[in-house]
């Protein structure tokens, strides 16, 4: 088997296709979560904490005084932008929580399907064994005129 054939076989597997779909959906989901955090959660946290905007929290490591992180970055000042890190952590926690819930739901659905198929398998009467079928064939052959 050539390397190209092996690659085609690898790509055609269901897990690779599922992973590709997951990555595409995950990339789209990241934008949604970023907007959720920046536009909805951070303002609520800011309201609770007295108007703190996490995305604008920074420590200036150089000379000068800057009113905002954007102004410090525009001036080329070295900054320790810990507010951006806090926002990234909040994004991560939300994404991790949603993925956890999705995996939990998928596992419940799988378990329910497995449980249902196991019940159906128990409910079906067992068919004749191979020996019983062979014995029936033998008996039929004995009875039939040659």
Curated annotation (Swiss-Prot):
GO cellular component terms, semicolon-separated: plasma membrane
Membrane topology: Multi-pass membrane protein
GO MF terms held by the record: mechanosensitive monoatomic ion channel activity
Domain of life: Bacteria
Transmembrane segment boundaries: 21-41, 44-64, 83-103
Keyword Cell inner membrane: yes
Keywords: Cell inner membrane, Cell membrane, Ion channel, Ion transport, Membrane, Transmembrane, Transmembrane helix, Transport
Subcellular location, record wording: Cell inner membrane
Chief location bin: membrane
Pfam families with a match to the protein in the record: MscL
Function: Channel that opens in response to stretch forces in the membrane lipid bilayer. May participate in the regulation of osmotic pressure changes within the cell.
Subunit structure: Homopentamer.
UniProt cross-references to NCBIfam families, sorted A to Z: mscL, PRK00567.1-4, PRK13952.1
Family, per entry: Belongs to the MscL family.
Name of the featured protein: Large-conductance mechanosensitive channel
Organism: Cereibacter sphaeroides (strain ATCC 17029 / ATH 2.4.9) (Rhodobacter sphaeroides)
């Amino acid at each position: 088997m050539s390397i190209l054939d092996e690659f085609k076989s690898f790509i055609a597997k269901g897990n690779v296709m599922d992973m590709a779909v997951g990555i595409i959906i995950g990339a789209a989901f990241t934008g949604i979560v970023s907007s959720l955090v920046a536009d909805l959660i951070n303002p609520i946290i800011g309201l609770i904490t007295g108007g703190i905007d996490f995305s604008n929290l920074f420590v200036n490591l150089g000379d000068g005084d800057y009113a905002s992180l954007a102004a410090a970055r525009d001036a080329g000042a070295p900054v320790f932008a810990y507010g951006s890190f806090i926002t990234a952590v909040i994004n991560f926690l939300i994404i991790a929580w949603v993925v956890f819930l999705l995996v939990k739901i998928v596992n419940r659905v799988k378990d329910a399907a497995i449980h249902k198929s196991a019940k159906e398998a128990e409910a079906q009467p067992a068919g004749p064994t191979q020996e019983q079928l062979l014995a029936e064939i033998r008996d039929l052959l004995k009875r039939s005129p040659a």
